[in-house]
UniProtKB/Swiss-Prot annotation:
Keyword Cell cycle: yes
Keywords assigned by UniProt, alphabetized: Cell cycle, Cell division, Cyclin
Amino acid composition bias (Polar residues), ranges on this chain: 325-343
GN (gene name): CYCD2-2
Region annotated Disordered, chain positions: 325-356
Positions with biased composition (Basic residues): 346-356
Lineage: Eukaryota, Viridiplantae, Streptophyta, Embryophyta, Tracheophyta
One GO process term, biological-process aspect: G1/S transition of mitotic cell cycle
Organism listed in the record: Oryza sativa subsp. japonica
Protein name: Cyclin-D2-2
């Protein structure tokens, strides 16, 4: 492919931390002290993927998690969005096509699981807030590229050039300036809240609570990551808060590995989430057989899979064989394109005029 950008020289590379989610920064330096008192980030966590920058499950204090729960809905789609998706309108088709494409590119570059989750989060929040044009088919592809580009800039240490993200059935080829303009539109629509609260913000906390403070194994952390990204495609999971999804994920994984009984553990716990919604989320996971898919996937191979394995088969053929789950390193030496999967740029439509 093309040249990869190392370092932070690329435009719009973001440097937010968890304190920025709660607005704890930017107050004469005092924000960092407040965040430290609350147990915000940097206070330890489970790093199973060896990289950090989205690969760590932080163990935050009860007070800080309570603040995250209070703020998490600020990073969710607008009200009424799920109903629009259920009606099968334009938002539904855009979402499906965009997630399918994002999954393929995410797996191709072997990005981390949080990058995938953030890209879909940006997509959903944008679609819920923006009036979509019916006669601008190119915009759906440009939006997909921009959301994934922003997510990788937030979480990855090796960030491909925007042009290099445009692979796998890309009908149009957008110039970097068009992608950057769309990124600005997305960020403005999202009110510049890119360091979103996601289920990954809570998984370390719930693992610590439900696993009696014992560090979980690589397998448990891997399953939690897989199950979390496995909820992305089904829009019904949008009815749950990130904290509720995280609690359901951790309990489901621990129950599957016979560390606890789901119902009793949930009932006896003192966690700052709606237990009824956690149970409903778990029941939807069972209905979708997500845990079963993860178990079968892990049983079929001794090599840890990418989190993408719990998504549909359309993504499977593009999965990396890297032994590190959620690795953010791009195996640039192994990027030989399959002519059936990625058409040459010369055969795809290039927008010479400014689309936005």
């Amino acid at each position: 492919m093309g040249v990869l950008c190392f370092g932070a020289s690329n435009i719009l590379l973001c440097a937010e931390d968890s304190s920025s989610v709660l607005g704890l920064g930017g107050f004469g330096g005092g924000g960092g002290e407040v965040a430290a008192e609350l147990g915000c980030g940097g206070g330890g966590g489970f790093d199973f993927f060896g990289f950090g920058g989205g690969a760590v499950f932080p163990i935050d204090s009860d007070e800080f998690v309570a603040l995250l729960v209070e703020k998490e809905m600020d990073h969710q789609p607008q009200r009424g969005y799920l109903e629009k998706l259920e009606l099968g309108g334009l938002e539904c088709s855009w979402r499906k096509d965009a997630i399918d494409w994002i999954c393929k590119v995410h797996s191709y570059y072997n990005f981390g699981p949080l990058s995938l989750y953030l890209a879909v989060n940006y997509l959903d929040r944008f679609l819920s807030s923006f009036n979509l044009p019916h006669d601008e088919s190119w915009m759906q592809q440009l939006l997909s590229v921009s959301c994934l580009s922003l997510a990788t800039k937030m979480e990855e240490t090796v960030v491909p050039l925007p042009m290099d993200l445009q692979v796998f059935d890309a009908e149009y080829v957008f110039e970097a300036r068009h992608i950057k303009r769309m990124e600005l539109i997305v960020m403005k629509t999202l009110k510049w809240r890119l360091q979103a609260v996601t289920p990954f913000s809570f998984i370390g906390y719930f693992l610590d609570k439900f696993n009696e403070g014992k560090p979980p194994s690589y397998t448990l952390a891997s399953w939690c990551s897989d199950l979390t990204v496995g909820t992305l495609k089904d829009s019904r999971f949008l009815s749950f808060r990130p904290s509720e999804i995280a609690a359901a994920v951790v309990l489901a994984v621990l129950a599957e590995n016979q560390f606890l009984v789901f119902n009793s553990a949930l009932g006896e716990s003192e966690i700052p989430v709606n237990k009824e919604m956690v149970m409903r989320c778990y029941e939807l996971m069972v209905e979708k057989a997500l845990v079963k898919k993860i178990r079968n996937s892990n049983a079929s191979s001794s090599v840890p899979h990418s989190p993408i394995t719990v998504l549909d088969a359309a993504c499977f053929s593009f999965r990396s064989d890297d032994t590190t789950l959620g690795s953010s390193q791009s195996n640039s030496n192994n990027k030989d394109y399959n002519s059936q999967d990625s058409a040459p740029a010369s055969k795809r439509r290039r927008l010479n005029t400014t689309p936005i």
